[in-house]
Structures are given as C-alpha cells and as structure tokens.
Amino acid sequence: MSIVMSLVGVVVLLFVGFLFSNNKKAINLRTVAGAFLIQAAFGGFVLYVPVGKDILKGVSDAVYSVIDKANDGIRFLFGDLANFKMGFLFVVHVLPVIVFFSSLIAVLYYLGIMQWVIRILGGALQKALGTSRTESMAATANIFVGQTEAPLVVRPFIPTMTESELFAVMVGGLASIAGSVMAGYAQMGVPMEYLVAASFMAAPGGLLMAKLMHPETQSTQDDIITLPDDPDKPSNVLDAAASGASAGMQLALNVGAMLLAFVGLIALINSMIGGIGEMLGYGDAALATAFNALQQAAAATPELQAAFNGSLQALAEQAHVAVNALAITEVDRQWVIDAFTPLQQPELAAASKAVVDAAAAHISLEMILGYIFMPLAWLIGVPWNEAMLAGSFIGQKIVVNEFVAYSYFAPYLKDLADGGQIVAQTGVAMSDKTKAIISFALCGFANLSSIAILLGGLGGMAPSRRHELARLGMRAVVAGSLANLMSATLAGLFITLS
C-alpha cells in the first residue's frame, strides 16, 4: 500500500505542476520526462541499488571527515565547549561549520575545481534535457552553492535570459541548499546521505518543475563555451580562504539571528494561540483534568503508584524541579508525552494515553500547520499516524524556513536512549521511512522569505529584471517546493522497496 501511495504522490505532484503551467501546450515532453527520469534514476541508484548506496555512503563519510577537520578549529576557539561537555550548543557546533565550509568552497572555486565539475555536470544536463547551457549550468551550481552564489556562474547572461530561463534559475536556487548550510544540517543530526542525495536530485527536480510550470516559448542563447571569470576573483588561495570565511561568518550570523528571532516569535505566537485554545477547551485545563484522572487511577494499588511515581520523577528531573513543586501545565508538553507514554500497565493505559493526547492537543502554530499540511505529507508517503507531525515540519519550512523546520525535526532523529522524542500520535519513535521523507522534503530554500533573497541577489545582478523576479517569486516557491516534495516522495518509494 505504501508503494502505491508513493506512486500516487508522484502523479499528483506532476499534475499540480501541470495545473500551474502558464502555457500547457508549450511543455517540452523531452525536457520534463528526461528531468523526471534523471531525478528518479539518481534517487533509485543511491537509495536502492547496493553499489549506489555504497557510493553515497562513501561520499557522505568523506564529507563527515571534512566536517571533523572543522572541529579542530572549533575546539581551538571554544575549548571544552566543543567536546559537548555542556551538551549540544547550536552556536558552537553548527554555526562555525558553516564558516569553515564557506571558506573551503571559496578555495575550490579559486582553484577551478568547482567550475570543472559544474561544466561537466551542466553539459550533461543540457544534452540530456535539451535545456539551454545557462540554466543547466546554474542548476548544477546549485548542487554546491546557494541561491545567491549559483547565478554568478552565468551572471553576464542574466539580463538577456528568456523569462523561462530566468524562472529556471530561480527555481533551481529554491529547490536546493548551499553546501555550507548542508554541513550545518548534518551537525544537527540530519543524515548526510539524505542531504547529499537531495542536493543532487534538486538539479533535475528543479528543472522538471520549472519547465513544467513555465515552459520555454522564446529563442535562447546557447552559445556559452566557457564559464565567465569572476571579476572579484581573489588574488591567491589565502585571499580566497579569507573571503570565503568572511562570507561564511556573515551567513552564520544571519542564520543565528534568524533562528533566535523566529523561534522566539513562534513561542510568542504559540502563547497567544494557546490562550485562545484554552478558552475553546484545549490546553492546560484538558491536560490538568487528564493528569488528575491518571493520579486517581494510579492510587488504586502500590504497584501502580510506583509506576506512576517513576514517570513523575523522570518528568521532574527533566524540568529541573522537585516532584512536589511540579505543575503539569507549566512544563514542556513534549516532556509530558515522553514521561507518560511508557506506562504499560493495563490499568493505567487509558489514563496515561489521555494525558499524552491532552499534551499533544495543545493548540500551537506547529499544530495548525500540521493539520493544514497533513494531507500533503500523507500524499508523499508518510504513514497517516505520523502525517500531522510531518505536515507541521513541511509547513514550517514553507512558511518560515528550512533551518527552523530542521531544528524542530532534529530531536526526532535521535534514538530514544539518546534523548530522542516520541511521536505523540503513535507513542513510539518516528519510523525510518518518515525520517527519510522529511529529511528530503525540508532540503531546499523554497520558502516565502527566500523571495526577498532572490530579489536582492538576482535583482542586484540584473536590475532590469527585478519586476519579473517579483512577479515570478511566488510561483518559483511553489515550483521549488514541488521539486523538494518530489525528491521526498521518490526517496520514500525507494526506501520502501529496499
């Protein structure tokens, strides 16, 4: 059944892209079919075929090895903080890795290695799909760098691109992530294999949705022989490393500031929504009632009381308060879920489930997004009992951004023994298939705030196209999101088959 659901999801995503097309008769079947086949074939090779899985693991291990070298610099700056003596610290273990990878990529660009790889892969995409060289090069560059850096490889041609080419460049940037932030996601616990696979699948996936929603109707420039030199090229390797580190620091500061602001704003919104929810019968009152009922059920026998007290003690320790000072409505709802889910005594099963359900039912922005995007998550292959949680992450990624979504998703990637979170609707850890689907679905810059980034980046390179960029921005977010969801659906399909 899950295989059938994944296939249905693929068809529906293609149909949605077709519905959004601005010229259905002009769709080039060779380009669209070829892009889909490349995206699916690559996903199948690295997620299903044993040799491909081994290659993907080798690449991922190599990237992890490079990240480990970044830790030497982190330890030099932060000392024992880098050794997790105070637990996982985002500002210590993630943001510096972004700086390191930005510097490394700048060095690879200076040495010409990145251009060589982009030229080969971009040329292959061009020949396979019949797309122009400019959009193929930009799509390939997005595998390695971000939405503002990738267009630099075709910067002189942006003012004269056709509208379809410009749209493809926009979608390519939104469907992918930068290599520097990919390292940051890996440090948060997202499997590197999934991040690498998603980055490569984003190139054909972005072109697929771009050419489905905005097919080419004009003649294109297809006479680019070599990639243009960067007029701001560093004078030597050291200059490249330094400029890359500076750019990485700016990116890391932006990421840190963004997370601080958005997580705080989400907490504020949740507080406001929670008050409204309590008036509607949700929230604290329902949780307190369910908890009191569990207390009464546990008082029936000493054995039940001991089991209840054990869970209560674990909750108090997590909240850093004494048991007699613990107020069930004032602690983190996820802690309540984790503490009372393990109560397996038949006499307490119903009452403890009521507590877990009441804690999970607390109205929040994440819950609202979960219900809105729940059908979409189910459509791309997430089991129904995990679809609301998955839908919440997808919604956060589109409405806020992928870094915030990954930060809320990361605890579910851990083993329960290492402090991982339980899915409230199932009472157990998240399934491996759902972890994979969400990892792929979130792996892209396609969100509302990225429209402003595109306007600033591409608009600065071609001020004459700023009006078109603004007009196409929302459609590009839709296309980029569809590309991410297609990769996620295919990943779920091949993981199920394997």
Segments and roles (model prediction):
Residues 1-94, 239-242, 259-267, 304, ...:
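N-terminal alpha-helical transmembrane segments of multi-pass membrane transport
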Residues 9-20, 35-47, 95-107, 176-184, ...:
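Hydrophobic core segments of alpha-helical transmembrane domains in multi-pass membrane transport
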Residues 19-23, 77-86, 125-126, 150-159, ...:
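Cytosolic juxtamembrane amphipathic/interface segments immediately preceding
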Residues 69-131:
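Hydrophobic alpha-helical hairpins/lids featuring a short glycine-rich hinge
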Residues 119-153, 220-240, 282-288, 365-369, ...:
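Juxtamembrane inter-helical linkers in multi-pass membrane proteins
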Residues 126-186, 391-478, 482-490:
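Alpha-helical membrane segments and immediately flanking helix-loop junctions
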Residues 200-254:
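Long, contiguous bundles of hydrophobic transmembrane helices that form the permeation core
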Residues 249-423:
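Transmembrane helical segments that form the transport core of multi-pass membrane transport proteins
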